[in-house]
Amino acid sequence: MKQLLCYLPWLLLLTLLVSPLNDARFVVEKNSLSVTSPESIKGTHDSAIGNFGIPQYGGSMAGTVVYPKENQKSCKEFSDFSISFKSQPGALPTFLLVDRGDCFFALKVWNAQKAGASAVLVADNVDEPLITMDTPEEDVSSAKYIENITIPSALVTKGFGEKLKKAISGGDMVNLNLDWREAVPHPDDRVEYELWTNSNDECGVKCDMLMEFVKDFKGAAQILEKGGFTQFRPHYITWYCPHAFTLSRQCKSQCINKGRYCAPDPEQDFSSGYDGKDVVVENLRQLCVYKVANETGKPWVWWDYVTDFQIRCPMKEKKYNKECADSVIKSLGIDSKKLDKCMGDPDADLDNPVLKEEQDAQVGKGSRGDVTILPTLVVNNRQYRGKLEKSAVLKALCSGFEETTEPAICLSTDVESNECLDNNGGCWQDKSANITACKDTFRGRVCECPTVDGVQFKGDGYSHCEPSGPGRCTINNGGCWHEERDGHAFSACVDKDSVKCECPPGFKGDGTKKCEDINECKEKKACQCPECSCKNTWGSYECSCSGDLLYIRDHDTCISKTGAQVRSAWAAVWLIMLSLGLAAAGAYLVYKYRLRQYMDSEIRAIMAQYMPLDSQPEIPNHVNDERA
């Protein structure tokens, strides 16, 4: 209950916002229906064109009316009743008459189409003026079949429906013509049309359908506009906040210019996500894109901006903002200063001329009713009814040309428009390598990073694309730095699976935009041995040695110019000779020492027989003593 009370002020505000629409003048778009037989009901009647399927604008269709005995409201599949309305070869198409009630109008037509009907007439069950059969509001399940409805449908009054049923039940063959040739005025050789749209991309099924239509129809719209065959103008529905609520939190979050211009909250949650005022500001920006582009004689640029903004700046990716919009504007070459001037200040307590004009245009004038349905397409001041789909809308536009003045596109199903020839379609391009991300398709140009010579470019396709994977260095050096001087070329591209730019040895920098030569001599990175003399070169260095020496780069040292192997051999020879010499000297010393020691002992032995030696103790001579 507390949560409900919090929302009561906003619910009251919504009531006040929509209350002016109660007096709105809604015009039901009609087509002519002529009964050719039987005579009892022969004549011309009005029918209301259904706002789905594909009405045959500019043409007519003849058929036989059938009223089923079962499933008369067409709320179930006719296959459940083993009923088929497929026409036999040579027979007129089948127009199925069904009753209103119990299910959506679109479901009735879908079930009839699956059973083989060529058109559907829905008989009203209320005695009232004709109304427009619209699609279900925000119904996901119905969206699956609505987009596949291709047959026309129309609502007839209760009284006329009863006449048709009575004639059929009486056994009469009821033949009639559905005529859309006058559904759209066709006074001259130029068609004027307008699309009431919205920049909100989170409002459900209808927003998805609208975005898809804009992307699909862009190519045809630009061909017609560039050829001067049409005059297109976009519009955006806005509301105002009653003066009593302008200071409320709800109005502040949903409105700009102090409550003058408002839009509903995209997520219907005032505490999170984007606010209604964000939508109003973007709507205003898109209106100003059209105005600025129209002043330069290129109003068709609006289609480029809207489709690019949808792709690049979606709400679900949190990119629905001015920064993303500015990047799209820049890529399309739109004057941002003129755009800002057109938008004005959304916080000012003043009327915004652009949005004020939009509010005034919502009110119907002449044969055109008030705009109350979003989206709404108006062709030659008549509201379009039917499926918002390229071929269907193109048929409606072509029916607005005076006879014999239709452009070639109306007489052919082929549409060719090479948008990449104008400003490269606003896509990324590398002029030096003649590579572009712009691809021209039937539905208009697409900005998609290309594959060149087997190398895949990656990026958003609008402002950035770079080669990736093996072989990427063969394409403009992989987007990395490269330079050539005096016959020497260096590149920072590393040919690996990952995208990488790395300055080569001898350079330093980011590898992408700049690599600077490293002064190995000044920074003492090489050639630092005592005998070395250093000289810096571009991307490298030169090192020389004093005297008869040779510089070894890997070891940063100087050696004799004689070959290393010869030097090693001589060193081995000298080592052997030195070893032999030392061995000989040692042997000689040992020999000399031993010989001397032997000779000393022999001499001492001889001398000891004749005289006492200093080292020999004196021995008494007992023989002489006895003789004495």
Curated annotation (Swiss-Prot):
InterPro entries from the UniProt entry: cEGF, EGF-like_Ca-bd_dom, EGF-like_dom, EGF_Ca-bd_CS, PA_dom_sf, PA_domain, VSR_TRX
Glycosylation: residue positions: 148, 294, 434
Tissue specificity note: Expressed in seeds, seedlings, roots, leaves, flowers and siliques.
Membrane topology note: Single-pass type I membrane protein
GO biological process: protein targeting to vacuole
Signal peptide (from-to): 1-24
Keywords associated with the record: Calcium, Cytoplasmic vesicle, Disulfide bond, EGF-like domain, Glycoprotein, Golgi apparatus, Membrane, Protein transport, Repeat, Signal, Transmembrane, Transmembrane helix, Transport
Disulfide bonds: 420-438, 427-447, 449-465, 473-493, 480-501, 503-515, 545-558
Matching PANTHER family: PROTEASE-ASSOCIATED DOMAIN-CONTAINING PROTEIN (PTHR22702), PROTEASE-ASSOCIATED DOMAIN-CONTAINING PROTEIN 1 (PTHR22702:SF1)
Protein known as: Vacuolar-sorting receptor 3
Organism: Arabidopsis thaliana (Mouse-ear cress)
Lineage: Eukaryota, Viridiplantae, Streptophyta, Embryophyta, Tracheophyta
Gene name of the encoded protein: VSR3
